UniProtKB/Swiss-Prot annotation:
Name of this protein: Ovomucoid
Listed GO CC annotations: extracellular region
CDD domains to which the protein is assigned, alphabetical: KAZAL_FS
Annotated site residues (Reactive bond 3) in this chain: 16-17
Length: 54
């Protein structure tokens, strides 16, 4: 299954680039930075379902 390396996160500011990822919460995150910030906030409970929109 797909994984994303979030070891460099959280970051205070995310770039605006659009490369969507689908989280295990069925939410589409606009890019890796936004997704990884959410992963850190969830204490690791949020995982990547797949690349692309949910």
């Amino acid at each position: 299954f797909a994984t994303v390396d979030c070891s460099d996160y959280p970051k205070p500011v995310c770039p605006l680039d659009y490369m969507p990822l689908c989280g295990s919460d069925s939410k589409t995150y606009s890019n890796k930075c936004n997704f990884c910030n959410a992963v850190v906030e969830s204490s690791g409970t949020l995982t990547l379902r797949h690349f692309g929109k949910c």
